[in-house]
Amino acid sequence: GTGKTPMTEYLVETLRKEYKTATLSRGYKRKTKGFAIADQNTTAIDIGDEPMQFHQKFPDITVAVGEERLVAIPQLLHQQPETQVIILDDAFQHRSVKAGLNLLLTEYKNLYTRDLMLPAGDLRDVKTSRKRADMIIVTKCKSDLTEFEKNELIKEISPLPRQQVYFTEIVYAPPYHLFNAAKKADIGIGSDILLLCGIANPKPLMEFLTKHVHSYDMIRYADHHIFTIDDLKEIKKHFEKMQSTNKIILTTEKDAVRLEKFKT
């Protein structure tokens, strides 16, 4: 929930302009095993929702999955030898991989300095590992973060002299139709939203909707939830009960790739 996916997309968008770029992910909750590269027939079931999202948004790059990164990297380079940059979206804890640049993401409202290791907290590595980072990026910051607040956060993070600290925020683009990306949805202060959400940390989206729409109800699912026909029936029933003439079903990009299988 630190914002790895939007950061990966930002890096892809930036790097693919000059370098042959690839992403390599574990492919969490996919139904396949081993190494695979996405093609025109690939679905979220094959590679996982986040890699599928990358594949849909950036069809010109290589999107690969593999549980063992150390094994998958040479396989990727063998099949795509022109690759110049590989972005691993969740590999900081994989010490066997010697990355050219290590980025450590930590959420503004839940800095790693205040967190604990799994299962007591959300950390996947010991706090001392932050020394391996080249850059520390504080994600999901509020838009009006002051210089004083930034300096206080930097003091808490206590970076090494060689480490740079950056601050980012989430800016939501206009929503679009699930099966027609060119068709934009018009939501605003008069809209009543049914939010379908199966991501690790929906709080930033909930805070955004609280400020920008009339009201919202949320059906919450587990992260990487695989939608079923019964889920669709529940969604339809909930939506029909909403007493509004300006209602809309809204979901995240990551959830959307898992809903596309229902396209008719």
Question: Which residues fall in each region the model found?
Answer:
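Glycine-rich phosphate-binding loop signature in dinucleotide/nucleotide-binding domains
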Residues: 78-84, 239-247
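Phosphate/Mg2+-binding loops and adjacent switch elements
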Residues: 27-161
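Walker A (P-loop) phosphate-binding motif
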Residues: 1-40, 143
